[in-house]
From Swiss-Prot:
Entry superkingdom: Bacteria
GO cellular component, one term: cytoplasm
Name of the protein in question: UPF0298 protein RBAM_014860
Keyword entries, A-Z: Cytoplasm
Predominant subcellular localization, coarse grouping: cytoplasm
HAMAP family the UniProt entry points to: UPF0298
Family according to the record: Belongs to the UPF0298 family.
Source species: Bacillus velezensis (strain DSM 23117 / BGSC 10A6 / LMG 26770 / FZB42)
Length: 90
């Protein structure tokens, strides 16, 4: 059985504390230049986890990832340029 997962983006003042975020979920990515951590945890625990993480002094901002709520199936539409055949009259 797979649990639904959702990402949390945590902006930090310093990357020194990025290892401490492992206890909240799986650390997927750490950006050294922009000082943020992408963390994955269970979708039903996301609100509690965000409140807990934002209470720490080394955390600047916490944002949820909206990827699970996006529609990823796209409709294939033809280009307008390819739709018309301009060489018919020649």
């Amino acid at each position: 059985m797979e649990n639904k997962r959702q990402g949390i983006i945590v902006y930090l003042h310093s990357l020194k504390h990025s290892k401490m975020l492992r206890k909240f979920g799986n650390v997927h990515y750490v950006s050294k230049r922009l000082k943020y951590v992408v963390l994955y945890c269970d979708m039903d625990l996301i609100e509690k986890t965000m409140e807990k993480i934002s209470s720490y002094s080394y955390v600047k901002k916490v944002e949820p990832s909206y990827k699970p709520f996006l529609k990823l199936e796209f409709e294939s539409k033809l280009d307008k340029a390819k739709e018309y055949d301009y060489k018919v009259g020649i």
